[in-house]
Amino acid sequence: MNERDRRIIDVIRALRDGEVVTYGDIAEDAGYPKMSRLVGRILATTDEELPWWRVVNSVGRLVPGHEREQAAQLRSEGVKVSDGRVRNARYGRFS
């Protein structure tokens, strides 16, 4: 794994319960502000156990095809979800 991917994974791994951020937030925090699509690719392809459910698109939409599972995970952490979007998180962009 290259250094760029490792930095992105480290940022994702550090997300707290109830924290919801965007792909762009992760990319920026890892030092690659223009690489939000790479964050999605890493989440979709890595074998590492990561809290993928805490990452959403720029308007708070859940991951297509995984909405039910993602919403359940987020709700278990105290995040409000309705109509396929994060409405209120404990921490992060949508708090």
Enumerate the predicted regions with their spans:
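Nucleic acid-binding interface residues in structured DNA/RNA-binding domains
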Residues: 1-95
